[in-house]
């Protein structure tokens, strides 16, 4: 999937039936979980919600 902005990506992520979002690496991969690996990061805040977004 491609998104035009971080807001579009975040809003789409909220609609997915996910159990968890993992920033980093785990030994096992679980169903309905998003795993994100970040090389560098920046905290982005909006509407009383904040999350970390990575840049390559």
UniProtKB/Swiss-Prot annotation:
Give a Gene Ontology cellular component term annotated to this protein: virion component
Localization per record = Virion
Per UniProt, the keywords (alphabetical) are: Viral capsid assembly, Viral genome ejection through host cell envelope, Viral long flexible tail ejection system, Viral penetration into host cytoplasm, Viral release from host cell, Virion, Virus entry into host cell
Indicate the principal place this protein occupies in or around the cell: virion
What biological function has been recorded for the protein in this entry?
Probably functions as a stopper that is part of the head-tail connector and that locks the viral DNA in the capsid. During assembly, functions as a docking platform which the preassembled tail can bind to. Plays a role in morphogenesis of the virion capsid after genome packaging.
Source species, domain of life? Viruses
Q: Is Cytoplasm included in the keywords of this UniProt record?
A: no
Q: Which family does it belong to?
A: Belongs to the skunalikevirus head completion protein 2 family.
Q: Does the record's keyword annotation contain GTP-binding?
A: no
The protein in question is named Probable head completion protein 2
Please provide the Gene Ontology terms (biological process) for this protein: symbiont genome ejection through host cell envelope, long flexible tail mechanism
């Amino acid at each position: 999937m491609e998104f035009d902005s971080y807001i579009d990506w975040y809003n789409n992520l909220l609609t997915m039936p996910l159990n968890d979002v993992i920033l980093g690496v785990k030994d096992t991969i679980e169903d309905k979980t998003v795993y994100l690996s970040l090389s560098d990061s920046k905290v982005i805040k909006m509407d009383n919600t904040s999350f970390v977004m990575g840049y390559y």
